[in-house]
Amino acid sequence: MLDIQLLRKDLDGVAKRLADRGYTLDVAAFSALEAERRAIQTHTEELQARRNSLSKQIGAMKGKGEDTSAVMAEVGGIGDDMKASEAKLGEIQARLSDLMLGMPNVAHESVPVGKDEADNVEARRWGTPRQFDFEVKDHVDVGTPLGLDFETGAKLAGARFTMLRGPIARLHRALAQFMIDTHTQQHGYTETYTPYIVNPEILYGTGQLPKFADDMFRVEKGGAENTVTQYLISTSEISLTNTVRESIVDGAALPIKLTAHSPCFRSEAGSYGRDTRGMIRQHQFDKVEMVQVVAPETSYAALDEMVGHAEAILQKLGLPYRVITLCTGDMGFSAAKTFDLEVWLPAQNTYREISSCSNTEAFQARRMQARFRNAQGKPELVHTLNGSGLAVGRTLVAVLENYQNADGSVTVPEVLRPYMGGMERIDAPAQAS
């Protein structure tokens, strides 16, 4: 959530910055609510002052033995008026809150202004795409003989679900283990196991609700009269970041660095017809997530560090990639600045997103009321960051395509072999004669 003081101080400036993100701020609606809030608040303060004055008058009158019934009746009437004003003020503040919950974060000044992904800026590349001396297959054709089973996944759960079997399932698990081990042993993160189902207020904290309810899978429990609605997580960023919800952290404890391997569940409501073949866009996929909770003055250094941590995974796997600075119009709702990592997929002859690392500054912290005690001992909002380290399924796709061989086998990247029992390559099972 944006700082309401920023809106009150520079409403037109904020509206311009949000317009750069493709969001139209209803300046008239906000201004009208603010004017109404100020009027009611002023009226309430006047009533309070009048009641205080009358209370003193009653004390003086009683000291003189005078009749106070008329004055006390007026005080009672003021009390009723104050309750009505406070109720109205609460209603206005709730409407302001609803309006602000729908506003995205403002972009950092270093973010390039643009409309969509066409305006993103490439920051750098790493690695050279492999030159194949045979016809390259995509991950579906490479993986299907090795245990990638889309047919059974669809039979069990419908489109955009996949079954993995045998060595390819083991390779998928090996990738996640390798990522977690790297982040915990080399990058300083604490491994965390989180709930996969969370309460609605948790999603308000990180910004998925109310705007993106259609992208979430919802579950309900209880009978008709006591139904409780919860949500499957679309990323473990949600649960990891909310660990500091409604708390004041000791400044000496920062930075807090957490990582988790979890399934992620997304309805992909706006993705009809996109990436319908293969594992690129699934309703259920695994991801290793990185989250950092830091002091405000260190958050952009932390963002660079986090991007480096995601890059390290790709470099150790020997997968060519590029780093993209997202423009204002392509960033996620909560982000102030985002870098995407895109891995090379030879069958598509292009780079595809495999990680997104974002600094949300105080946007999520304000929604969660997550604070730390600064050097002066005063509570201050933390900054929160999140990043994929990496999407496991898409990394599997990249390994299958970049490490495929002419005979249909797949070479196991060297760093994964300890997790694969020393296996150097995955071969299709021999066909029965």
From Swiss-Prot:
<feature type="binding site">
    <location>
        <begin position="266"/>
        <end position="268"/>
    </location>
    <ligand>
        <name>ATP</name>
    </ligand>
</feature>
<dbReference type="GO" id="GO:0004828">
    <property type="term" value="F:serine-tRNA ligase activity"/>
</dbReference>
<dbReference type="InterPro" id="IPR002317">
    <property type="entry name" value="Ser-tRNA-ligase_type_1"/>
</dbReference>
<feature type="binding site">
    <location>
        <position position="388"/>
    </location>
    <ligand>
        <name>L-serine</name>
    </ligand>
</feature>
<keyword id="KW-0547">Nucleotide-binding</keyword>
<comment type="function">
    <text>Catalyzes the attachment of serine to tRNA(Ser). Is also able to aminoacylate tRNA(Sec) with serine, to form the misacylated tRNA L-seryl-tRNA(Sec), which will be further converted into selenocysteinyl-tRNA(Sec).</text>
</comment>
<comment type="subunit">
    <text>Homodimer. The tRNA molecule binds across the dimer.</text>
</comment>
<feature type="binding site">
    <location>
        <begin position="353"/>
        <end position="356"/>
    </location>
    <ligand>
        <name>ATP</name>
    </ligand>
</feature>
<keyword id="KW-0436">Ligase</keyword>
<dbReference type="InterPro" id="IPR042103">
    <property type="entry name" value="SerRS_1_N_sf"/>
</dbReference>
<dbReference type="InterPro" id="IPR033729">
    <property type="entry name" value="SerRS_core"/>
</dbReference>
<protein>
    <recommendedName>
        <fullName>Serine--tRNA ligase</fullName>
        <ecNumber>6.1.1.11</ecNumber>
    </recommendedName>
</protein>
<feature type="binding site">
    <location>
        <begin position="235"/>
        <end position="237"/>
    </location>
    <ligand>
        <name>L-serine</name>
    </ligand>
</feature>
<keyword id="KW-0648">Protein biosynthesis</keyword>
<dbReference type="InterPro" id="IPR006195">
    <property type="entry name" value="aa-tRNA-synth_II"/>
</dbReference>
<dbReference type="InterPro" id="IPR015866">
    <property type="entry name" value="Ser-tRNA-synth_1_N"/>
</dbReference>
<dbReference type="InterPro" id="IPR010978">
    <property type="entry name" value="tRNA-bd_arm"/>
</dbReference>
<dbReference type="InterPro" id="IPR045864">
    <property type="entry name" value="aa-tRNA-synth_II/BPL/LPL"/>
</dbReference>
<dbReference type="GO" id="GO:0005524">
    <property type="term" value="F:ATP binding"/>
</dbReference>
<dbReference type="Pfam" id="PF02403">
    <property type="entry name" value="Seryl_tRNA_N"/>
</dbReference>
<feature type="binding site">
    <location>
        <position position="289"/>
    </location>
    <ligand>
        <name>L-serine</name>
    </ligand>
</feature>
<dbReference type="GO" id="GO:0005737">
    <property type="term" value="C:cytoplasm"/>
</dbReference>
<dbReference type="Pfam" id="PF00587">
    <property type="entry name" value="tRNA-synt_2b"/>
</dbReference>
<dbReference type="GO" id="GO:0006434">
    <property type="term" value="P:seryl-tRNA aminoacylation"/>
</dbReference>
<dbReference type="GO" id="GO:0016260">
    <property type="term" value="P:selenocysteine biosynthetic process"/>
</dbReference>
<comment type="pathway">
    <text>Aminoacyl-tRNA biosynthesis; selenocysteinyl-tRNA(Sec) biosynthesis; L-seryl-tRNA(Sec) from L-serine and tRNA(Sec): step 1/1.</text>
</comment>
<dbReference type="InterPro" id="IPR002314">
    <property type="entry name" value="aa-tRNA-synt_IIb"/>
</dbReference>
<keyword id="KW-0963">Cytoplasm</keyword>
<comment type="similarity">
    <text>Belongs to the class-II aminoacyl-tRNA synthetase family. Type-1 seryl-tRNA synthetase subfamily.</text>
</comment>
<keyword id="KW-0067">ATP-binding</keyword>
<keyword id="KW-0030">Aminoacyl-tRNA synthetase</keyword>
